[in-house]
Amino acid sequence: MQRNFTAITGARAGKSAENEALLSQQRAILRARLAHSKDGSITCSVENCVLILENDPVLMGVIRKDLFTGCMVIVGDMPWHRAGSCFTDDDFAFIELLFENHYSITSEKKILTALRIVANSNSYHPVREYLNHLDWDRTPRVRFALHHFLGAEICDLNEELLRLFMLGAVTRIFQPGCKFDMMLCLTGGQGAGKSSFFRFLAGNDEWFSDDLRKLDDENVYRRIMGHWIIEMSEMMATDNAKNVEEIKSFLSRQKDTYKVPYGKFPADRPRQCVFAGTSNKLDFLPHDRSGNRRFLPIRIDPGKAEVHILADQQASRAYFNQMWAEIMVIVPANTRYNSLRKHPSN
């Protein structure tokens, strides 16, 4: 028995008979545009499925690919219950029902192929959009942020280390896989808000992760996807040379190659993230004759902080937004970042 999907879609377009009639009219026009077989039935082809996804009044414009997470997403309201933006099995089930009811297409394989094509053609990058829409108020904050929230010394070195880290993070977003093998490390002051500093710096809590427990975990690369700033707190607590060498090797990689679950082919996935470290110990790095240039340590002193980062989270997040806006002003030239990368200190 055919379900009355038009009545369901009324939840998106309005439940009035007028809107339902408009939906039917729009779909009739679309059906006429599709390729038909000799017997007059709609051809079950990928091309037809793409046309439907791009022009159906419920589906047009909502299927996209998030270039940051690599996932297919649905943006906007849909006529069925959803929790989040990621494309789910339930979404596919309802789309299959729509194709069957209104276009007599029942090929799961062709619908899925068309979904991938349309999503790829309608891709976007949420972090790039976030950064590109920031407007700096011309008040310097990068120089003072570490002191303001964590009590670190206000000095040229600390400013340059934070600026370098932020420039590396921005470059990884706009040029995925670029060379950036440095880790900003905040040391000292248990409970001072070091992890919160990196979480707020990520701009969005979903873009931050502290869930990277083991570097040899087979799922480590999937834990990286969709995160911009990744904190290695527990690993930094083990101050032995073997552990540090493992971290240095991991930091030096510019891409990860793996196959997603149910995927047919492995793919190169250039890194879009940077890594941060936190430690309550000041001497968290063992002696290394080859140098520890990849680690950029900054000592904090919470007793000298002007505010606790969690005291007013809205104000803190606004502060970090303006820090990124400040960084974005110098990104086009990017000369300081390139200079520091060419002449790293050990």
Where are these predicted regions, by residue range?
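Short alpha-helix boundary/capping motifs
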Residues: 1, 194, 275-276
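Short amphipathic alpha-helical segments and helix-helix/interface helices
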Residues: 198, 247-248
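Feature primarily recognizes SF3-like P-loop helicase cores of small DNA viruses
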Residues: 100-103, 109-125, 179, 206-210, ...
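Arginine residue identity/basic-tract feature
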Residues: 3, 12, 27, 31-33, ...
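P-loop NTPase catalytic core of nucleic-acid-dependent motor ATPases
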Residues: 118-225, 229
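N-terminal nucleic-acid engagement/recognition segments and initiation subdomains in replication
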Residues: 1-140, 156-160
